[in-house]
């Protein structure tokens, strides 16, 4: 099956070591594409068992080796969406659609999000409010941060980093049972998130 040279975009016949048009080393390209597909499959496996942070890591690696890997980019968008990062998800799908405008499931994902502009705006606002809560924590204004984070998580209950920050506030207050409950909710979204597990270990140690 012919492939396109990544350097000059020309269609080249299979089996060639170098692009006949620009001289690009196609062996390197094939190796990169193979590694990209390998990391995509690892990312897919992790996503299926809700190891979402692990999936994000694998899918980013996949795209590092082949930024044109549409399946990896679309799945990365889905995983971002599952962690409450709808804006990051939309960004990946828009890039995907720009790379492959036709017959791309990313178009459906974008349409579904854009069909609910109020919901998308609300999720976007929760990200901004999260950043404000983070600033409050850095300024030792944790009471205000906790109130904001509870509101954020009621509006965007998939936002993993929101659970982490609220749990950290509780840990600093030595309210370990509250922290444990919040971290358990985070673990239901992303089972093997390293931050969740590290915080749970700290809570259990108390």
Give the label of every model feature segment.
Residues 33-37, 70-71, 104-105, 126, ...:
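Helix-start (N-cap) detector for alpha-helical repeat units in TPR-like alpha-solenoids
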Residues 62, 95-96, 152, 185-186:
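Canonical positions in the second alpha-helix
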Residues 48-49, 82-83, 99, 115-119, ...:
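Register position in tetratricopeptide repeats
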């Amino acid at each position: 099956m012919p492939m396109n040279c990544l350097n000059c975009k020309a269609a080249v016949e299979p089996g060639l070591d170098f692009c006949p048009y620009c001289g690009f080393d196609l062996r390197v390209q094939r190796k990169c594409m193979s590694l990209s597909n390998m990391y995509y499959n690892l990312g897919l496996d992790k996503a299926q068992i809700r190891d979402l942070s692990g999936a994000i890591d694998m899918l980013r690696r996949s795209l590092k080796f082949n930024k044109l890997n549409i399946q990896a980019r679309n799945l990365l968008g889905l995983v971002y969406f599952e962690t409450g990062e709808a804006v990051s998800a939309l960004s990946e799908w828009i890039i995907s659609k720009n790379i492959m405008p036709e017959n791309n499931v990313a178009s459906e994902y974008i349409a579904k999000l854009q069909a609910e502009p109020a919901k998308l705006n609300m999720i976007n606002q929760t990200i901004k409010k999260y950043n404000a809560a983070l600033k409050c924590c850095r300024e030792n204004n944790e009471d205000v941060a906790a109130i904001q984070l509870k509101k954020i998580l009621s509006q965007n209950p998939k936002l993993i980093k929101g659970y982490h920050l609220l749990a950290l506030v509780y840990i600093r207050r030595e309210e370990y049972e509250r922290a444990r409950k919040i971290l358990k909710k985070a673990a239901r979204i992303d089972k093997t998130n390293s931050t969740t597990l590290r915080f749970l270990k700290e809570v259990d140690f108390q």
